[in-house]
């Protein structure tokens, strides 16, 4: 299984064609996740895109994706963990200050 980023390029459609094919375009956006740039004259005036993105990987495939996906080198992983711990410490302190104000 390959994990990759899918770039969804919008298709350009003229405003007249959009109006004539409204139902079909909306179905393609909803069911296929397609995007459209609506052109009026020489200008793009609107973009029609799915409101929510659908996951591109099934939950059952996540373990394999993480195992085979990109990894941090040891130095970056160590720095990442330090950054996470610093965020946790500062968040705890901020929460303590808020609680103390209510006591």
From Swiss-Prot:
Q: Per UniProt, which keywords does this protein have?
A: Toxin-antitoxin system
Q: What the protein does?
A: Antitoxin component of a type II toxin-antitoxin (TA) system. Upon expression in E.coli neutralizes the effect of cognate toxin VapC1, partially inhibits the RNase activity of VapC1 in vitro.
How is this protein named in the record? Antitoxin VapB1
UniProt organism field: Rickettsia felis (strain ATCC VR-1525 / URRWXCal2) (Rickettsia azadi)
Q: What gene is it encoded by? A: vapB1
């Amino acid at each position: 299984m390959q994990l990759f980023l899918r770039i969804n390029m919008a298709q350009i459609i003229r405003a007249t064609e959009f109006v004539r094919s409204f139902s079909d375009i909306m179905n393609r956006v909803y069911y296929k996740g397609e995007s459209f740039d609506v052109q009026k004259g020489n200008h793009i005036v609107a973009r029609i895109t799915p409101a929510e993105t659908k996951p591109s990987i099934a939950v059952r495939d996540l373990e394999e994706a993480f195992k085979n996906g990109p990894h941090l080198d040891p130095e970056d992983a160590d720095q990442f963990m330090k950054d996470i711990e610093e965020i946790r410490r500062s968040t705890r302190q901020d929460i303590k200050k808020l609680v103390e104000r209510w006591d």
